[in-house]
A protein has these predicted regions:
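Conserved AMP-binding A3 loop
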Residues: 50-52, 213-240
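Conserved pre-ATP/AMP-binding loop-to-beta segment of ANL
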Residues: 172-174, 179-217, 224, 249-260
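Structural core segment of the AMP-binding/adenylate-forming
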Residues: 67-68, 95-192
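Adenylate-forming
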Residues: 81, 126-136, 149-157, 265, ...
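Conserved AMP-binding/adenylation subdomain of ANL enzymes
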Residues: 236-260, 268-311
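AMP-dependent adenylate-forming
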Residues: 3-10, 27-50
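A short helix-loop-beta submotif of the ANL/AMP-binding
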Residues: 75, 81-101, 105-109, 117-123, ...
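Conserved AMP-binding/adenylate-forming core of the ANL superfamily
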Residues: 20-21, 40-83, 87-91, 108-113
């Protein structure tokens, strides 16, 4: 077939990509951790996290999941906004060989129940702000392990405690909830899971590009939300495609580690998720925006340091 569109590509945009550059998405993560080490990966509320910290935290959480008896291929739901725990959890899920099920934190109980049942998720990592929604439906799902994150978990010992206190007691953003406890369901705090995982051995899991990385659910605008099966190859290809089209702009940056991307789009959406992985591949960093609907704080965040990429959608 004559690819007539290629003549319209800019001169420095490649015509082809090769997803086989990586053996899996986990391979991409591993190389990022090895190559970028002490470079910053993200900043949230002025708390920076390096690639090395992301490596250590995600390995600890992955080890904790493995110690709970989860097997490769099991589905783990991730119900978090754009906070540092998101990348840690996502990397832990992938590195341990599980399938990541991204969940919109603003889902209603009905929507959440459908997605958890349809995906067959056996574990969930959720911000406590939204645990009241989970409490309404958890007994109708296959969830056996709930990891409860608090807003300040990864924001430092002093500032983090203050943020969690403010969110709970001043802003009153954590509605009351009660989750069942027993043999069939365990509740663990995010910080406790990390602490326990640091004492356990992490077992690397062989993976290929054809393994399932994500069950990424559609918006549900025309009916029930449907889980799109995304393999490691799908995500790697998306990352390389995005990088190819950003190449003309990125070539003007002498040091990609200084490239600052604004992560205001929800990371549980595939577009923002792809750009998160692109940052990892390049060694650049993300400015995490937990609540972009708060425009005053959003603008304040944008003013704090120069940014180079602001992904958005026209809706």
């Amino acid at each position: 077939m004559d690819k007539i569109w290629l003549k319209n590509y800019p001169a420095n945009v490649k015509h082809e990509i090769d997803p086989n550059e990586y053996s899996s998405l986990t391979d991409l993560l591993t190389r990022a951790f090895q190559h970028h080490g002490d470079s910053p990966f993200s900043v949230c509320m002025e708390r920076w996290m390096t690639y090395r910290e992301l490596d250590q935290l995600s390995q600890a959480l992955g080890a904790w999941f493995q110690a709970q008896g989860l097997k490769p291929g099991d589905r783990v739901a991730l119900m978090l906004p754009n906070i540092p725990q998101f990348a840690v959890t996502m990397a832990a899920i992938l590195r341990a060989g599980y399938t990541c099920v991204n969940v919109n934190p603003l889902y209603t109980a009905r929507e959440l129940e459908h997605q958890l049942k349809d995906s067959g998720a056996s574990a969930i990592v959720i911000l406590e702000n939204f645990a009241h929604t989970l409490s309404e439906v958890i007994e109708h799902t296959q969830i056996q392990h709930t990891v409860l994150a608090s807003m300040g978990d990864l924001l430092g010992p002093v500032y983090g405690r203050w943020i969690t206190f403010a969110v709970r007691h001043l802003a009153k953003m954590v509605p009351e909830f009660e989750l069942p406890l027993g043999e069939n369901h365990k509740v663990t705090s995010f910080k406790d899971a990390i602490a326990a995982g640091r004492q356990q051995s992490f077992k690397a899991v062989p993976q290929t590009l054809d393994d399932i990385a994500f069950l990424q659910y559609t918006g549900g605008t025309t009916g029930l939300s449907k889980g799109a099966v995304l393999t490691h190859r799908n995500i790697v290809a998306a990352i390389l495609q995005a990088e190819t089209w950003f190449a003309p702009a990125l070539e003007r940056m002498p040091d990609l580690r200084k490239v600052n991307s604004i992560a205001a789009l929800p990371l549980y959406h595939i577009f923002a998720l792809t750009l998160c992985f692109l940052a990892m591949r390049q060694g650049s960093h993300l400015t995490l925006v937990p609540n972009p609907r708060d425009f005053a704080k959003f603008i304040e965040t944008l003013k704090k340091r120069p940014f180079h990429m602001l992904p958005g959608v026209n809706t």
